[in-house]
Regions:
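Glycine- (often His-adjacent) and acidic-residue-rich active-site loop
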Residues: 72-114, 130
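Conserved CoA-thioester-binding segment of acyl-CoA-metabolizing enzymes
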Residues: 2-73, 113
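Conserved catalytic cysteine-centered active-site region
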Residues: 111-124
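Gly/Ser-rich catalytic serine loop of serine hydrolases
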Residues: 124, 128-133
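Residues that form or flank phosphate/diphosphate-binding pockets in enzymes
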Residues: 43, 78, 133
Length: 133
């Protein structure tokens, strides 16, 4: 099966359509953010990065939240960047791919800086693998 067909199948899987990338649960003053793509090992895809960035910003702005805990669903915290998303696309030039990957990496760096500069304590509850974390 070609890489393009695999990517299309993954993007259209029921889990990908229905489930949020990040589960959010406030327990007392602790905001739990759980990466929610266990079948794919919770990769840092564009969607996951955007959802985490948004959830962290919301927790930062919420006066009820004192602590944020990042967790992963399933046996792995995160397998790192989504390599399928980084793969060349049909008809894409080298420069187009480089620009697309640069956007993904820039968004990820901004998310990481959001964690570093958060006014809230952020704790990672890591189980299993945590690649490129």
């Amino acid at each position: 099966m070609s890489q393009d067909k695999l990517q299309t199948i993954d993007q259209h899987a029921p889990e990908a359509e229905a489930a949020p990338y990040v589960l959010e649960e406030l327990r007392g003053h602790v905001q739990w953010l759980t990466l929610n793509r266990p079948r794919q090992r919770n990769p840092l895809s564009s969607g996951m990065i955007a959802a985490l960035s948004s959830a962290i910003a919301a927790a930062d702005a919420d006066p009820r939240v004192r602590v944020v805990v990042l967790a992963g669903s399933g046996p792995v915290f995160s397998a790192g960047h989504d390599l399928r998303e980084m793969s060349p696309r049909p008809g894409e030039t080298h420069d187009q791919r480089a620009a697309r990957i640069r956007r993904i990496l820039d968004d990820c760096a901004a998310m990481m800086l959001g964690i570093v500069h958060s006014p809230k304590a952020i704790i990672a509850c890591v189980q299993g693998t945590a690649t490129a974390a």
